[in-house]
Amino acid sequence: MFTLKKPLLLIVLLGIISLSLCEQERAADEDEGSEIKRGIFSKFAGKGIKNLLVKGVKNIGKEVGMDVIRTGIDIAGCKIKGEC
């Protein structure tokens, strides 16, 4: 059993080292790719994404505002009628 531990440990260490080197190369390649993608998407999709987010926030604001108004009207009507 002891004779198998050293070669097994060596294989594991070499595997970890090669894996870390591959991850570093992959990260460098992804950085270069993201810079290229960022340049393409910022020209075409940047304004579209911004407009989409602004419209979404406006719609959410309108819905929340309407809910607050409805709740306020319901409470006021309840107090006027004396049902609360």
UniProtKB/Swiss-Prot annotation:
Expressed by the skin glands. GO terms for cellular component: extracellular region. Keywords: Amphibian defense peptide, Antibiotic, Antimicrobial, Cleavage on pair of basic residues, Disulfide bond, Secreted, Signal. It comes from the Eukaryota. InterPro entries: Frog_antimicrobial_propeptide. One of its GO terms (biological process) is defense response to Gram-negative bacterium. Disulfide bonds join 78-84. Residues 1-22 form the signal peptide. Residues 23-36 form a propeptide. It is found in: Secreted. Belongs to the frog skin active peptide (FSAP) family. Esculentin subfamily. Has antimicrobial activity against Gram-negative bacterium E.coli ATCC 8739 (MIC=6.3 ug), against Gram positive bacteria S.aureus ATCC 6538 (MIC=3.1 ug), methicillin-resistant S.aureus ATCC 43300 (MIC=25 ug) and B.subtilis ATCC 6633 (MIC=25 ug). Has no activity against fungus C.albicans ATCC 90028. This is Esculentin-1SIa. It comes from Odorrana ishikawae (Ishikawa's frog).
